[in-house]
Amino acid sequence: DNSYLIKLRENVRWSNGQRFTSEDVRFTIDRLKDSQTIYSANVQNVTGVDIVDDYTLKINLDKEIPFFEYNLTFPILSKDYYEGEDFSNTNKNSAPVGTGKFKITDAQSSYIILEKNSNWWNKEKEITLEKITVNLYSSIGELYNSFKIGNIDLIGTSNDNLQEYIGTIGYSSKEIKGREHTFLALNMSNYFLSKQEIRKAISYSIDRTNITDSVFNSKYYTSSFPLDYGNWLCQEQDSSSGYNLDQAKQVLVDNGWSYKNNYWQKTENYKTQKVALNLLVKASDSAKLSVAQNIKSQLENQGIRINIVQASDTQYSSAISSKNYDIAICSMYVSPSPNLDTFFGADNLSNYSNEEVNDIMNEVKNTTDENILKEKYKRLIEIYKSDVPYISLYNNKYTVAYNSALVGDITPNWYYLFYGIEGWYK
């Protein structure tokens, strides 16, 4: 479907008292298309917005975008507040109006103050927090020092060595699995990798925990699927394709492979083939080089020979684009959208094709039924682990540290660190 009909909540007002309407949404999309911001890509395929009424609009796309509704997660601008302004340079950006629980009442070079928004639409929601101060710092060192002496109540960081900077006392912390996903792409145009038993044996032979422990000192999470970061469609995980050396050997033996002279090999058409593969990694990424060496060691201990190809950034990009690799270590920030075209769509990284997967991918694009989506994604996960076109390795870790005196339900998630902030106090 190339169009979306959007219904807005009625009786919502901006913090300055003006009504929030469809015109504000269209104005925002137009500004995003005219500007270069982190949200511009969200609307790059929008060809136009038709206003149906004050609370209904139709968004038209130049092509079908699976799960386009997940692109509609950008802040909305008030047309009345911003119209006629140079959006990139206006002073109004320092204190924009909003429709949320809190509003900006003061903005300076070193801090921003937010206070309870009396115009917020949900009058039934109790908000105990009266005021939030956002402190701004010119360096991360200043930020950490300010947290240590108690000037800040909460910080969020992907720094793996946070304790070295803020110590271990006076605060609590919670860890969140991030969306930076590292995985192996197995090029199925390769003779060996075209065989499911080889791909399975490789997966069974890699101990992901060994990688996160030895390379990252346990500061990364092992992962088993691209959406395995807390996405609602990937909640149930099993270990069916986890580390299991006995299964690695058995799946090869069952398919006619034999282990001789430290190689897994097989004779077909009077020719003996010994399993040997190239592993592509970006030479400039020292951590990934260590991961590659770890994987090489694990696989060669099981008779699967690995040659590490250390490529320059340019060479790596070229190899990925042309699919000129056997196995590639890849990383990407997985979108909040459950769209898996990168992994299963046309021209995917593994040259993988599966008719059932194609059918599921087409079905999930055209339904909003949560039960159907859960059922279909459960099946996608099963196929991912059975066919092994990719091997998920690990995700980054995000840490939220907060003052021990801070009270309330502090439950940050991968999408929003300040979930439930309206009920915090100290």
Where are these regions (language model features)?
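Aromatic- and charge-enriched surface segment that lines or borders ligand/interaction sites
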Residues: 1-36, 58
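Gly/Pro-rich hinge or "lid" segments in bacterial periplasmic/extracellular proteins
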Residues: 72-127, 131, 141, 245-250, ...
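Ligand-site clamp/hinge motif
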Residues: 119-165, 305-307
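Append "and occasionally in soluble cytosolic enzymes with long acidic Gly/Pro-rich linkers
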Residues: 194-296, 379
